[in-house]
Design a protein with these regions (language model features):
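Active-site-adjacent beta-strand/loop module that shapes the phosphate/pyrophosphate-binding cleft
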Residues: 71-94
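Conserved Nudix-box catalytic region and its N-terminal flanking loop in Nudix hydrolases
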Residues: 14-56
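Short loop segments at secondary-structure junctions
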Residues: 15-17, 24, 89-94, 109-111
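Nudix hydrolase/Nudix homology domain
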Residues: 31, 99-136
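Conserved N-terminal beta-strand and adjoining loop/helix that marks the start
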Residues: 1-19, 70, 87-89
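A short coil-to-beta-strand element that immediately follows conserved catalytic motifs
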Residues: 61-69
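A generic structural micro-feature
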Residues: 2-4, 32, 76-82, 101
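Structural detector for helix-capping/boundary residues
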Residues: 16, 38, 52, 65, ...
Length: 136
């Protein structure tokens, strides 16, 4: 049976840095760096789901959410992901990671390019994300 999954992520800014979190062995992609977010639950409001995922993964509350872009990828013959990527701001840089992640960094532009995987960087390039972010 085919499956469609909606994932929401947010580029979270604090003091002109972007929060990256590193996956633990909890799920596939161990050691990959990513921006916070996750799946939307059935019946959940988009921003409520985004806030829930960010709180669960980082302990942060965010504000000023702006939808930056949407993407889709067929990850297997029976599974398609639709991704929404937002821009948000944090009031604090104090991160409390869940068991899904093992490390974090408030990344500069250089670190962002070095740490993120190619598909995410390709999405960022396609949507000119690095050009619109006010980061060091």
């Amino acid at each position: 049976m085919a499956e469609l999954w909606l994932a929401q992520k947010s580029i979270i800014l604090y003091n002109r840095k972007v929060l990256l979190i590193q996956r633990s062995n909890y799920a596939s992609g161990e050691n990959d760096w990513e921006i916070p977010g996750g799946g939307l639950r059935f019946g959940e409001d988009l921003l409520e789901g985004l806030h829930r995922e960010i709180r669960e993964e980082t302990g942060l509350s965010v504000y000023g959410e702006k939808l930056l872009y949407a993407m889709t990828a067929l990850v297997s013959p029976q599974r398609q992901i639709v991704g929404l990527t937002y821009l948000s701001y944090a009031d604090s840089d104090e991160v409390t990671l869940s068991h899904e992640h093992k490390d974090y960094v408030w990344a500069s532009r250089k670190q962002l390019v070095e740490l993120l995987n190619k598909p995410m960087l390709d999405d960022f390039e396609k949507h000119s994300i690095l050009d619109i972010l006010d980061i060091d």
